[in-house]
Swiss-Prot record:
Reactions that this protein is recorded to catalyse: Na(+)(in) + H(+)(out) = Na(+)(out) + H(+)(in); K(+)(in) + H(+)(out) = K(+)(out) + H(+)(in)
Cytoplasmic-side segments: 1-21, 92-95, 197-210, 273-277, 345-350, 393-415, 465-482, 536-726
Biological source species: Mus musculus
Gene: Slc9a7
Record protein name field: Sodium/hydrogen exchanger 7
Oligomer status and interactors: Interacts with SCAMP1, SCAMP2 and SCAMP5; may participate in its shuttling from trans-Golgi network to recycling endosomes.
Membrane topology of the entry: Multi-pass membrane protein
GO CC annotations, alphabetized: membrane; plasma membrane; recycling endosome membrane; trans-Golgi network
Membrane spanning residue stretches: 22-42, 71-91, 96-116, 176-196, 211-231, 252-272, 278-298, 324-344, 351-371, 372-392, 416-436, 444-464, 483-499, 515-535
Any GO molecular function: sodium:proton antiporter activity
Main location: Golgi
Post-translational modifications reported in the UniProt record: N-glycosylated.
Lineage: Eukaryota, Metazoa, Chordata, Craniata, Vertebrata
Amino acid sequence: MEPSDAARPGPGRAFRGLSPRLLLLPLLPVLLGRGLRAGAAASSGAAAEDSSAMEELATEKEAEESHRQDSVSLLTFILLLTLTILTIWLFKHRRVRFLHETGLAMIYGLIVGVILRYGTPATSGHDKSLSCTQEDRAFSTLLVNVSGKFFEYTLKGEISPGKINNVEQNDMLRKVTFDPEVFFNILLPPIIFHAGYSLKKRHFFRNLGSILAYAFLGTAVSCFIIGNLMYGVVKLMKIVGQLSDKFYYTDCLFFGAIISATDPVTVLAIFNELHADVDLYALLFGESVLNDAVAIVLSSSIVAYQPAGLNTHAFDAAAFFKSVGIFLGIFSGSFTMGAVTGVVTALVTKFTKLHCFPLLETALFFLMSWSTFLLAEACGFTGVVAVLFCGITQAHYTYNNLSVESRSRSKQLFEVLHFLAENFIFSYMGLALFTFQKHVFSPIFIIGAFVAIFLGRAAHIYPLSFFLNLGRRHKIGWNFQHMMMFSGLRGAMAFALAIRDTASYARQMMFTTTLLIVFFTVWVIGGGTTPMLSWLNIRVGVEELSEEDQNENRWQYFRVGVDPDQDPPPNNDSFQVLQGDGMDSVGGSRTKQESAWIFRLWYIFDHNYLKPILTHSGPPLTTTLPAWCGLLARCLTSPQVYDNQEPLREDDSDFILTEGDLTLTYGDSTVTANGSSSSYTASTSLECGRRTKSSSEEVLERDLGMGDQKVSSRGTPLVFPLQENA
């Protein structure tokens, strides 16, 4: 008989008599494992949070330290500028004969550079060197995965292996080393614009032919002579085993281009203080202004030289002419862009009421002028050329449309910016000698460079002066030529061009050599300017009317027909007697209309059309344009022209004189350019009228053999007073 279901033991009933605690024993390992995992997770999470907090704290400390170092570096340069300003003020009261404040600013920079280089401790633990291989060139941007976190790094340049543990570990030295683009986009525009905006056009255009010859032909000659001589030096370095990397012929030409950029700021400052001869000042200033523009375009053309074939540095006629075309295209395009920007600014200031708000007017003028540089660079042209001709155009047209307050503000604004930028660059040059990380010193290359620039300057000045004197009636004397040869300083432009590209071994050697050349020329040549003026018997103390006197239309006596190398003759209150033959004047006047026709045409076009269109001055367009352009003429002519037919004048603007600007004074008689006279005989009046018939072209014909400028009466050449444009 089978037992019943009630008597049969079931699974639950078998353990019914056991304790509940004993039933949990099999689950204990599982529960313990989960608890341990949960505890480990909690502890790891807390550790991760602590680690993240520590990283954030370290990042904040690094950011704070970086901000502090930035403030210290900027404060360093501000203190350098402050010290330079105080030095300039001191030099105004007590001049040091053989030292200029520009050279002293470089000395201040050197002292600070030594302190930063050897007096600041090197940081450690922040930089690590990692080795990697790549088939291509160095990456400009690198994305690094560090434990699941991605960090972005940017390329700063190649570092020589021997300097990894020295300069590169000093964060302070990194802070005071600026990006080269800072010089081009921030510091150079106000310097170049001020040169064009403050240009004394009367003296500049009187010597325009010679200035263009020195700036274009002279710079090209200097570039190729220096480049070829330095190529010989490089070959010598290779023979003696002092060349550790590649140095091509195109690199030598590039060095010749950048080192041909003269910047006689020290000499010109001394000329201005001593009131040296205005023609010598105009030649040096005009050459340096255009020379900078030519040098930067020439260097860009050399960089663009790419011959066909495997050897990218061999001579190729097609590539050469292509580089010449690039030079002409960049220069003409930059010139056009600068002039167009100036014209647009003139139109905006003419056809708006901005003159009622001088602050807005000055701000717009400033932004339009600065944007010219950036616009040219963005379009592939050269901003230096564009902003230079923008400044000249602004001074010739836009200046007339500005209110009196805006005129003063704009001049003072760019003068201050020019002063600060230039002194900042010279102070930074001294600093860079010890803080720059990529110096390559080569004694043979440095000595060869000094010899090459001396020979290049000599080949630049003397042969060109000889050929120019063949066509100039007023010769460039030997003392002027020696002074121009002596005044070939290198400065801000050469430094900015050299520091812009220091990626290769050759460019680093160029930068170091350029820096030393700038030091030498500023200290030695700048300090020897005053003794050289005395030794060459160049006259100083040539007074020129102030701007206030010009605005009040006071008379200024202008010496015509006199060699600027000679001492000024004695004069009295009514006239100056110049030595010469009156018949030469009559013979010279016959060639006036043949030699100055280009300038006459430009002056007529500018006076009758451009000035009335772009400014509030000049004759009404209704009288100069054809009748069928009457509507357009009425729209473009300013109402001020109808109210006041007398043209508004700008400071030193019209480099060609009008008939009314010319008056001859002889004894108690006055003869105007149109032949009218007072207290004088009719025959003499008619004679003087014939001699001064082409008086509006006389100023132009000073250069390149453009006729004789002597005006005589009864066999005695005279000097006539000119009414300076206000």
